[in-house]
Amino acid sequence: MSYRELIAELAREHAEEFSDALLELGALSVSVEDADADTPDEQPLFGEPGLTPDRTAWQRSRVIALLAPEHEPAVLLTAAANEIGLEAAPSFTVREVEEQDWVRLTQSQFDPIKIGERIWVVPSWHDAPDPEALVLELDPGLAFGTGSHPTTRLCMEWLEQSVQPGQSVLDYGCGSGILAILAKKCGADPVYGIDIDPQAVESARHNSERNRAEVTYGLPDACPTGEFDIVVANILSNPLKLMASMLSSKVKPGGRIALSGILARQADEVAQVYARWIDISVWREHEGWVCLSGTRRESH
């Protein structure tokens, strides 16, 4: 069985309600993308906890709807346009989508990832390219963190260079557990991972068991008291600023902290908040994202 993919471009103010109308009229799925993606006019668009996004769609939005064989694209498009009061239906193209083995197709899109000097992140359906390397077995899943995002990569490279055997580590905002697992494999002990999402905590526990890495996970109310040799938090800039006092207090005097999920243009603002307790600066930048690193001062 083959499906059809309807692709239309709309102005920002119509994209969301047009997508909703397509779903109501029977589209199997709808996604919205930046019509200027991979061009100089591409626009980043995301929100952070505690902040309201200033936009909910791109200036030129591409709406992509997957249609069952019985749906006529032009008829569906016209009906959706009428539903939201457009004077005319937008121009569109149609692409045939053949039935596929979606599991196999998805797996083919995820290869082992080399990070730093000796780290490999390997999906379960692949063999490690270098058996002597520091291997983390992780499958793409519901929790953030498989090593492909620049911020995860930056934190992993920092941990590889920073963790010494026997040091205590706190991964705040642990997601999939990838950073906590890496810290453990680098010799840290004990290692704790904290996340606000119960599903992420369960995912992290599963990943730690698969990697035979002993890490204690929990929600924020289970965060251990006391201080750590190393604290790492790969979240976003606004939550990092809001939690600056708490995260800084978790670092031992003389201990180190790494922060990411920060765009390069946000680095100074985040660093200024932490400067009250931490001697902090940009450690490394990658693809427009940065990792801040610092040491807690002995006098605080």
UniProtKB/Swiss-Prot annotation:
Cellular location(s): Cytoplasm
Highest taxon above the source species: Bacteria
Keywords tagged on the record: Cytoplasm, Methyltransferase, S-adenosyl-L-methionine, Transferase
Binding site for S-adenosyl-L-methionine: T152, G173, D195, N234
GO CC aspect terms: cytosol
Top class in the EC scheme: transferase
GO biological process: methylation
Entry-linked SUPFAM superfamilies: S-adenosyl-L-methionine-dependent methyltransferases
Catalytic activity, reaction form: L-lysyl-[protein] + 3 S-adenosyl-L-methionine = N(6),N(6),N(6)-trimethyl-L-lysyl-[protein] + 3 S-adenosyl-L-homocysteine + 3 H(+)
GO molecular function: protein-lysine N-methyltransferase activity
First and last residue of the signal peptide: none
UniProt xrefs under PANTHER family: ELECTRON TRANSFER FLAVOPROTEIN BETA SUBUNIT LYSINE METHYLTRANSFERASE (PTHR43648:SF1)
HAMAP family linked: Methyltr_PrmA (MF_00735)
Protein name, entry field: Ribosomal protein L11 methyltransferase
Source organism: Paraburkholderia xenovorans (strain LB400)
Gene designation per UniProt: prmA
